[in-house]
Amino acid sequence: MGKPPSRHPEERGGEADKPRRTTALSSFEGDLRSPPQGDGGQTRCGFIALIGAPNAGKSTLTNALVGSKVTIVSRKVQTTRALVRGIAIAGAAQLVLIDTPGIFAPRRRLDRAMVTTAWGSAHDADIVVLLIDANKGVDEEADAILAKLGEVRQPKVLVLNKIDIVDKPALLTLAQKLNAEATFDATFMLSAATGSGVEDLKRWLAEHSPAGPWHYPEDQISDAPMRSLAAEITREKLFNRLHQELPYQATVETDVWKELRDGSARIEQTIYVERESQRKIVLGKSGATIKAIGAEARKEIAALTEQA
């Protein structure tokens, strides 16, 4: 057994604005309204698994489809370690978006578990969306995914992401190559970062989701509690600031979320790292790094709770 992880409380007493109503991301209080009815008075609900290589843009696309931040985005690979469900509404359809860990050739046990989780989500979903970084094209990771994709029986959609930085002729060639290697029910070219083409994909997913009742209230955008999302936001800021210096195993936990009388909230978090040397990196000189991370996280958490 190794030593327990070093820990340092993220700047105690951080405050974020209190939500305007008591609606957490994972719960709903108040009157439940019936969802809008589609043609023939029928609602739809589809579980959509987003799979792809690390940094293909799955988390960015999840946020774009939902219209709000429900999963963190970082340059660092494998920042999505568990299944994240974002919930989007498109007319009479509810789309439960499963943002999965990136699929690659794993070496460590944790990596193998994450890749297994991603493929398990694909087999359990109603529709599978494969994201390809159009700027990278078909590399070894994409080839490995395509080779195994044939085992998935669900409808499959190919999405070429990051089209804002790729020439159109190259996109068309890439789309033809990928469709020759695997069978897809539809192909979309979009930019999750700019939003271009996202609505077309959303509309298709809604139209092809199975008929059935919604699984979540209309106002809910994620199945994660707000305190969990707050921890993930701090982890995102941590990785964005210390991209090279910190392993992705670093974690953040929200220990306290207390709403105060003045309408703010007191949030206390703990950052866990593996070694004392990493603790010093997170702290920075005279605590400058941890203070900057805390300030960035508080700003985003405050904005998110105001729109929740």
Task: Show where each model-derived region lies.
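Conserved C-terminal guanine-recognition region of P-loop GTPase G domains, centered on the G4
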Residues: A92, T116-T187, K258-R261
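Canonical P-loop GTPase G-domain recognition
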Residues: P155, D164-S222
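Residue-level signature of catalytic and energy-coupling elements of molecular machines
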Residues: I51, N55, L61, V84, ...
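Conserved, well-folded catalytic cores of nucleic-acid-processing
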Residues: S68, I87-G91, S121-V128, V152, ...
